[in-house]
């Protein structure tokens, strides 16, 4: 496979063009491109450009609505609810973090729940936006079954990423962003596309045997981080 290197601003313009061809508005295409390019720049390649085809395919299959009518409902001065109308996840997340920041600035706390959305990349990208406003931030989401309970080889839990961010007193904030699995699925997909091996102990094949083959891992299951120790964390509810 031939590798092509592009400067971030050039790549961003191309990504915007692609998203617009798939029906996104200029604004939504730019928001989505910014998130993908950020992932590349921070080294989270499994959540970067390698995901572009996935989003485009989901638009084509009508899983993602390129022209959503997003509704924001005010529950209280601090709490808001967003119905994203199956928008691309980046747009829903962008609206949500901005609303949370706005609510927090008014009352001291901002809580925002989002429904009818999809994959939005790195939670840390959004947490950092709030941290730059001097806010402590927590972001939670869930996903389809991909992780097996400790001692099993059938998926039951989502990777259910958790993210925490806080100002650090320096220019570099503290951001913790992790799925509750040994490795996120984006990294497995990236390894598969680039013929890379996985670390041992992060996934099982479909027969329940440990594998370092990314293709076999995609057909199998991911393992919970810290094994039995964090298995209990996976059982915690992530939605009401």
Protein language model features and the residues they cover:
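Conserved small/polar residues in nucleotide/adenosyl-binding loops
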Residues: 232-240
């Amino acid at each position: 496979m031939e590798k092509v290197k592009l400067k971030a601003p050039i790549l961003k313009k191309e990504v915007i063009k692609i998203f617009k061809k798939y029906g996104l508005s200029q604004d939504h295409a730019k928001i989505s491109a910014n998130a993908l390019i950020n992932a590349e720049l921070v080294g989270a390649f499994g959540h970067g450009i390698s995901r572009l085809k996935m989003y485009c395919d989901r638009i084509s299959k009508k899983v993602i609505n390129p022209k959503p009518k997003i509704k924001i409902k005010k529950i209280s001065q601090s709490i808001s609810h967003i119905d994203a109308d199956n928008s691309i996840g980046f747009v829903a997340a962008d609206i949500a973090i901005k609303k949370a920041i706005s609510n927090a600035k008014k009352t001291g706390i901002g809580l925002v729940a989002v429904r009818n959305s999809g994959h939005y990349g790195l939670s840390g990208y959004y947490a950092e936006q709030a941290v730059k406003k001097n806010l402590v931030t927590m972001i939670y989401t869930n996903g389809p079954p991909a992780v097996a309970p400790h001692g099993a080889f059938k998926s039951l839990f989502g990777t259910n990423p958790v993210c925490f961010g806080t100002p650090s007193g320096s220019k570099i904030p503290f951001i913790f962003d992790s799925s509750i699995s040994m490795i996120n699925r984006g990294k497995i997909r990236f390894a598969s596309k680039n013929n890379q091996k996985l670390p041992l102990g992060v996934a099982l094949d479909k027969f329940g045997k440990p594998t370092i083959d990314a293709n076999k891992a995609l057909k199998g299951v991911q393992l919970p981080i810290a094994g039995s120790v964090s298995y209990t964390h996976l059982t915690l509810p992530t939605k009401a």
